[in-house]
Amino acid sequence: MILMSRMLKQLLWKGRRDKGMNNRLEVIGIDHGWSMMKTISQVFVTGVKEITTTPAFFGDVLEYEGKYYKIGTVRQEVKDTKVEDDSFYLLTLAAVAKELKRRGLKEAKVFLAVGLPLTRFGAERNDFIKYLTKNKRVDFKYENEPYHIEIEDVAVFPQCYAAVVDKIPTMAKKTLIVDIGSWTIDIMPVINKSPDESKCVTIPRGLITCMRSINEQCVRQLNGEIDEAEIQNIMRYGRADIDDEYLAIIKAEIEDFVEKVYNSIREFGYNLKTTPIIFVGGGAVVMKNFGNYDAKNISYNLDVKANAKGYEQLATMGLKSAKRLA
């Protein structure tokens, strides 16, 4: 596959340049969503807030450069890019700590495998790498446990593609991948088992825009708002023990969102009855729960960690090919 070959060549080239380095690396895939941060094993809210005094409790608390931060509370506001402030850097440290704890490590050489929307990949890739590698050696504490990491390098992969990389070899002649994330919807056709980059589309109309519409209608009709966590719960399970009037508004807005997604797919020339379509990302469960299409050609990958797993898989493949990883 052309796209995968290109990614692997980048890692092979770096392998020749750094052939003297220690091969023992901890590859950590991280999906930096605007709503949720994901690794191959962890999911937490994309929230970080400075604590101005020494905390009484250290659960989900990051200590970095003499400051304390609460991780995973209220979602960050969406910005034009992910490198405008230190929020995603701090969230990356938290994600690394969570993964290292799972692996029983406090010190490690880390190779970060991350992603960006396919159509913004070229424009934002270098800035994202510089942002994540601005400090080669990092000392910090998470939940009052000390960590020392050396960030060896960063590989950036296209999201959406990463979510299905393990399934591409078994795909039909033409398959459409629709990755519904927090802020964007990526539409990627795979033709003869290779992504057609010329027809990839990124739409800035993900789940956060749906939740905003829900609360706008709740305020307009009932003069009250619903917590995003409650809305996400309804998206995930299709039900909730809340007031019927609010529930009706939420369901109506979600159904409208789903229909707009299908309309976008139609507008780009795909037949909803014949084109094999795979929904991935956090919105896959929304399409499954609230969509009106129950066709054999439509399937759903409900694993919200699929992109993070794909990033880690792609990076591991490249590093092994470059003999930088045993």
Language model region names:
Residues M1-I177, S194-T209, Q221, A229-A326:
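Nucleotide/phosphate-binding catalytic cleft detector across ATP-hydrolyzing
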Residues I187-N192:
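PRPP/pyrophosphate-binding module of the type I phosphoribosyltransferase fold
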Residues I180-D186:
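Ser/Thr-glycine-rich phosphate-binding loops at phosphate-binding pockets of nucleotides
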Residues E225:
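Cysteine/selenocysteine-centered motifs that mediate thiol-based redox chemistry or coordinate metal-sulfur cofactors
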